[in-house]
Each structure stands twice: as structure tokens, then as C-alpha cells.
UniProtKB/Swiss-Prot annotation:
PROSITE patterns xref list: CB, TYR_RECOMBINASE
Provenance organism: Xanthomonas axonopodis pv. citri (strain 306)
One Pfam entry name: Phage_integrase
Cellular localization per UniProt: Cytoplasm
GO CC aspect terms: cytoplasm
Any one GO molecular function term: tyrosine-based site-specific recombinase activity
Keywords tagged on the record: Cell cycle, Cell division, Chromosome partition, Cytoplasm, DNA integration, DNA recombination, DNA-binding
Organism ancestry: Bacteria, Pseudomonadati, Pseudomonadota, Gammaproteobacteria, Lysobacterales
Domain Core-binding (CB): 3-88
Domain Tyr recombinase per the UniProt entry, residue ranges: 109-299
Protein name: Tyrosine recombinase XerD
A biological process from GO: cell division
Alphabetized SUPFAM superfamilies for the sequence: DNA breaking-rejoining enzymes, lambda integrase-like, N-terminal domain
Location (main, coarse): cytoplasm
Amino acid sequence: MQPADASVIERFLDRFWAEQGVARQTLESYRRDLEGLARWRDGAGGGLLGIDRAALFDYLRWRTRANYSPRSTARLLSTLRAFYGLCLRDGARSDDPTALIDPPHLPRSLPKALTESQIEALLAAPDLDTPAGLRDRAMLELMYAAGLRVSELVNLPAVGVNLRQGVLRVTGKGSKDRLVPLGEESQHWLERYLREARPLLAANKPVAAVDGQVPLFIDVSRQPLSRQQFWALVKRYAAVAGIDPATVSPHGLRHSFATHLLNHGADLRALQMLLGHSSLSTTQIYTLVARQHLQKLHASHHPRG
């Protein structure tokens, strides 16, 4: 990658973080997308700022031949639109090469939820005789009880928990805060983690702030767990619980939270608020899952099903 492209990418990421307040994971996705295009573009001259629409079409065709998924390509186009839109506003370009490029069609896939019995088995999988096991039980309980995104869970600051009132203050997408009730079960395990496990993981030493805030969930190095670490934990506990790990993901716990609430009669608007969705249309996909559940119940138990 050319040094000029590396410099342009850094400036874009700095600007976008300052103006939009996007999450660190989103910035890293933008970086990967732009660096991938820059490396493919190496040697062609002009770098990222000199690319035209024809070259972008060539890159998209190359990605198709390389078996990149349509979802990955759609995200790439979103990154490039943000990047070249900023270049256009700043006068670094006189046009937007992503204009008139349509994103690939994405089939609307229904979120996959675990059954309630599978959730119970998964939550019971950690070894409660170890500090890490207690921490993991609290994390799993909290993710299912509050419907958190994995990034929200691993980045949750200690000050975001109010055990007296039984609520979490969660910072979601777009740096938007929301209050989420804990529930008795998740509050119980969170209290046990804070009382019995966290001091041992921290070796009774102060936990340093990360990005200005002290993390709630830590490992033995007194650092927050990464999304990848938590992903691996969920897969491991799925195997312990007798569930195919390929069918389980951290986001699946969020899907299960939403689906089970709807199955038990939750209001769609309330669910939207709990999930932190900016648009109700994003939440409505769960009604399809709930409807399928009701149809299966009817077919199984109604005399004329």
C-alpha cells in the first residue's frame, strides 16, 4: 500500500470518528475495507483518490471471483460511500466514483434463536468453581437477559451497572445510551461475579481504565475480554451444553432474547427500545420468527393442525 493512501485512510478515520462518533470496531472495519482496496490498487497510479468508477467495478468483479460474500461487498460499498463522500465535501475529489453502483441484493435471513431449553443448558455450562467460570456465567446471563450486542457486553464499563436500581446503562451504535433492566437472575450472577470473581481476576489490584472507563468484565491481565475471546467462550460452552457450536454465536443470544420476549407477549415498541434499534423496521423481523413459532405450536397441538 502506498504511503499516500495510508495517510489518507488515517485522516478519514480520524475525521469520521470525530464527526460521527462511530465505534472502534466500525472504524476497524472501515480501515480493512479501504486498505484492501488500496492494496488491490497498488501500482495502478493515483491511489485511492485517483480511482474511477470503472476501476471500482473491476475491483467488485475481482471480489466476486475471489468468493467474497455479498454481505461483505455491501459493507465495503457503504465504507467507500462514506469515504468518497467525505473526499467530495473536502474538495479532494470533484466526483463520487461510487455513484450509480448498486449494492448486491441480500436475501433477508431470519435471525436464528436457541430454544429456551438450549439457553438454560448454555447458561449452566461454565465451571462455577473458578473465577473465570463465574465471570463467564455472569456475561452469558447478562447478554441473554439484556439482549446486548457483543461489543456492548465486552465494552461495558463498571459504572454502567446500577445494582440498586437493577438497570444497565448501555452505549450502543452511534454512541446512543439506553437503560436496560437486569432481571433477578442476571443481577444475582453479576453480584456474585463482582463479589467473588472479579477481585481474584484482578489479583486485588486496581483495574486500569480503557478509553477513559474501567471495564466491568476482565481477564487475569486485568484487561477487558475481546469480542473474539467471548466468541470462543460461547462456542466452547455450546459444546459443553451439547449444542452444535456451529449453530451458536454471541449474536444468537441477542436473537434469542428478542424472540423469547415476543413469544411471551412482549410489545414490539418495547423490544425496539431494549435492543437499541433506531428503526422499528429492524425490530419487525423478529415478528416473523415469533409467527413461525406460533405456527409450529398450532401444527403440533391443535386437533386440526
